[in-house]
Amino acid sequence: MAVFHDEVEIEDFQYDEDSETYFYPCPCGDNFCITKEDLENGEDVATCPSCSLIIKVIYDKDQFTCGETVPAPSTNKELVKC
């Protein structure tokens, strides 16, 4: 079991759209970071690249769903393999 330095809500992070990464200040002077892809995959641990501290990210997993929603095919249509 990991020992977290803190628990921080995702709203308190800074978001960089170019890298799709969330950042939060670390006591060592660097930043904890976690990517949008990590959050979509259900990860909730942000790490600091400069020290061994980690924090737990508190967020609504439903807001970070991976992939797109595809409607189910109608039952009265024949499926054709492409």
From Swiss-Prot:
Q: What is its main location?
A: cytoplasm
| Any GO CC annotation of this UniProt entry | protein-containing complex
Binding locations of Fe cation: C26, C28, C48, C51
Where, by residue number, does the polypeptide cross the bilayer?
A: none
Q: Where in the cell is it found?
A: Cytoplasm; Nucleus
**Which keywords does UniProt give here?**
Cytoplasm, Iron, Metal-binding, Nucleus
Keyword Cytoplasm applies: yes
Look up the record and name the pathway of this protein. Protein modification; peptidyl-diphthamide biosynthesis
Q: Which GO terms describe its molecular function?
A: ferrous iron binding; iron chaperone activity
Q: What's its catalytic activity?
A: [3Fe-4S](1+)-[protein] + Fe(2+)-[Dph3] = [3Fe-4S](0)-[protein] + Fe(3+)-[Dph3]; 2 [3Fe-4S](0)-[protein] + 2 Fe(2+)-[Dph3] + NADH = 2 [4Fe-4S](1+)-[protein] + 2 [Dph3] + NAD(+) + H(+)
The UniProt record lists the DPH-type MB domain at 4-60
One GO biological process this protein is involved in is:
tRNA wobble base 5-methoxycarbonylmethyl-2-thiouridinylation
**Which cofactors?**
Fe(2+)
Q: What does this protein do?
A: Required for the first step of diphthamide biosynthesis, a post-translational modification of histidine which occurs in elongation factor 2. DPH1 and DPH2 transfer a 3-amino-3-carboxypropyl (ACP) group from S-adenosyl-L-methionine (SAM) to a histidine residue, the reaction is assisted by a reduction system comprising DPH3 and a NADH-dependent reductase. Acts as an electron donor to reduce the Fe-S cluster in DPH1-DPH2 keeping the [4Fe-4S] clusters in the active and reduced state.
* PANTHER family in alphabetical order: DIPHTHAMIDE BIOSYNTHESIS PROTEIN 3 (PTHR21454:SF31), DPH3 HOMOLOG-RELATED (PTHR21454)
User: Subunit structure of this entry?
Assistant: Component of the 2-(3-amino-3-carboxypropyl)histidine synthase complex composed of DPH1, DPH2, DPH3 and a NADH-dependent reductase. Interacts with SERGEF.
Entry's family note: Belongs to the DPH3 family.
**What's the entry's take on its domains?**
The DPH-type metal-binding (MB) domain can also bind zinc. However, iron is the physiological binding partner as zinc binding impairs the protein electron donor function.
- The entry's protein name is Diphthamide biosynthesis protein 3
Query: Which gene is transcribed and translated to give this protein?
Result: DPH3
